[in-house]
């Protein structure tokens, strides 16, 4: 599977005492694609998304979930930085050839 980043940092969202807390996790090589669009509606606000394809070999015991945060590089911060983006959807493609198995993430 084609990858273009050596890894990324995932922050698993958990709730502790009614407040969100995060568990830092590192993922191996991923394919990271930023998509920038201009909305054609009246507000003209840009719609920016990031598509991340994570090979099954890069997943280390945890599959990303909706509302987790993700950063496009390996960082050592224990809490997500302001540049972290929120995962909006996760699709798993864990069938077929092992070299083609992957997880697709859309984040904003």
Identify the function of each model-found stretch:
Residues 1-26:
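Active-site-proximal polar cores
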Residues 20-108:
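Short, conserved turn/kink motifs that form compact alpha/beta structural patches or helix kinks used as
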């Amino acid at each position: 599977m084609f990858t273009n980043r050596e890894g990324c940092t995932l922050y698993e969202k958990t709730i502790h005492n009614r407040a969100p807390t995060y568990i830092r996790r590192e993922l191996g090589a991923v394919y990271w694609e930023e998509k920038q669009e201009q909305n054609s509606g009246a507000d003209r606000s840009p719609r920016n998304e990031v598509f991340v394809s994570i090979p099954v070999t890069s997943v280390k015991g945890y599959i990303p979930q909706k509302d987790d945060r993700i950063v496009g590089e390996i960082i050592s911060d224990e809490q997500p930085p302001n540049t972290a983006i929120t995962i909006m959807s996760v699709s798993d493609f864990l069938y077929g050839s092992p070299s083609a198995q992957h997880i697709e993430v859309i984040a904003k």
